[in-house]
C-alpha cells in the first residue's frame, strides 16, 4: 500500500513525463521521428533544429521552461538526421564541385529542398491533429520555418526565430577561419568516432557563449550518445547543400503576418548579426531581441537572458 501511495505521488509530480510520447509522422513516404513532451492540454509549440542537429540537441532547460509556463514542446528530427528517414542512398555530395559552383555564384542541385523540409514539420502537426501551434526555430531551422510560416500562415500563433537569416549564405556571409574549416571537414571527410568527437568539441567552443561553463567529459559522452543514436554522418552534407541551393527568402518573410520574435547574438560567428537584424526588419509584425554576449547556441547564459521575454511573447500570443 505504501508503494502504491508513493507511485501515485510520483505520477502526479511527473505528469509531463507520463504524457510524453514519440512516434513517426509520414510525409509522402518520408518518415519523420518526433517526441511530443506534453502535457497534451498545454499550448503546443513546435521546435525545429538546425543543420545536422538531432532533436536531442534541444537544451533540457528550454523544454522545462516551456512546460513550466503552460506549453507543450514538440520536437522532431529533420529529414536526413537522427531517427528520421535518411537519404544515404544518394551518397555524400561532391563538395569540391559544389563549393566551386557556390563560390562562382552558380546554382546548386540538392537531393531535397528547404521547402521539402518545411513540409516535414507540417506533417508532424497534422499527424498530431494540431490546427494551430506556436513555432520556435534555430539556425537552419529558421530558414526552413521561414518557408513553413510563409506558406501556412493560418497554422501558427507565434513564431520565434533564433540565430537565423533570410539570406542564402554567400561569400560575404559564409563562416570564416577555423569554423569554416571544421564545417568543410565535416562536409568532405569520413572520420572516425574519435575524430568526430574532437571536431564537435572544437565547433562547440566556437559557437558557445563565452560565459558558458564547459564540461568536456560530459560533452564527449553526449556526442558519443548521439552518434550511437544515429550514425548518418553524410546527412549533414546533403542538408548543407539544401541550404546553399535555396534562394534568398526576402519576399517570403515580408509576407509573414504571424507575430514574430527574432533573437540574435552580436557575437554569432555562423550567421552574421546584421543578417538577423535585417530579417527582423523585413518581417512586418516582428520584435527584435539583441543579445550582446550571445554567440550562436542557446546555452545556459542565453537561456537565462531570454527566458522572460520569450515566455511573455508566447503568452501574449496564446
Language model features with spans:
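Alpha/beta-hydrolase
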Residues: 174-251, 278
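Short beta-strand/loop motif that positions the catalytic acidic residue
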Residues: 256, 262-264, 268
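Conserved acidic catalytic loop of the alpha/beta-hydrolase fold
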Residues: 103, 107-111, 115-133
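Conserved hydrolase catalytic core segment
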Residues: 131-171
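Conserved alpha/beta-hydrolase "acid-adjacent" motif
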Residues: 269-275
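Catalytic active-site module of serine/aspartate enzymes centered on a nucleophile-bearing elbow/loop
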Residues: 286-318
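Conserved HGGG/HGGXW glycine-rich cap/lid loop of the alpha/beta-hydrolase fold
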Residues: 30-100
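N-terminal cap/lid segment of alpha/beta-hydrolase-fold proteins
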Residues: 19-31
